[in-house]
Amino acid sequence: MIRFLIPTAKEMKPSKEVPSQKLSEKSEAILTEMAKLSTDDLSIAYKIKPEQAEKEKQRWDAILAGEAKNYPAVELFNGLMYRHIKRKDLSTCEKDFLSHQVFITSSFYGIIPAFYPIQEHRHDFHTKVKVNGQSLKNYWRAEYDQFLEESQVPVVSLLSSEFEDVFSPSLRKQLFTVSFMEDRNGILKTHSTISKKARGAFLTAVMEESCQTIDALRDLSFDDFYYRKDLSSDSELFFVRKVKKV
């Protein structure tokens, strides 16, 4: 068996409502700090326009009041990566895979299972807020480290450095990483759009093929991406897609 870590997303799209889950003490402490912030404070913390900050203020107030609706995390997040993850018409095996092998790294909830019930909110490790005098990365480090320390199976990171940096450097080395590139006339290139789409497509391929070992991941091909042994190492997997000349 393998576990996969994926990031959260700013873009959200409410789906079918589910029962709520009591917030952990660590999340409650973050909620307390976020609820103290005014619309202007949120505008600065998020680096967004005042009208957008007003929407976020309403969301935090609703969570604080216990009035916010809850949705499965993997269905609520709707960023580019998530839109490329198969989330509808899942077979029993595919849903079981998402339920037990895919975990989402959140700066508000911690590391949660894919279908964990969450509320609409905007929060990531770039959010300028301190909890108990700590940055969000330091605040969550012990719990993130514990996830890796207690994992009895390989953990594959589909995270950006923003999320990987939460783990202690010594434990971060335990992660298997996956990178995606395009071959344009012999020149290898990558950028965030390629990576986000490919992460979702990769996870879908893993789910559909029921890959349960790192070697099985190396055998995958999807969306014209193929494993490149010459670029890869024992813990780093590179997949490249050739782009035809226009």
Curated annotation (Swiss-Prot):
One of its GO terms (biological process) is response to hydroperoxide. One of its GO terms (cellular component) is cytosol. It comes from the Bacteria. Disulfide bonds: none annotated. InterPro entries: YaaA. NCBIfam families: PRK02101.1-4. Belongs to the UPF0246 family. This is UPF0246 protein str1967. It comes from Streptococcus thermophilus (strain CNRZ 1066).
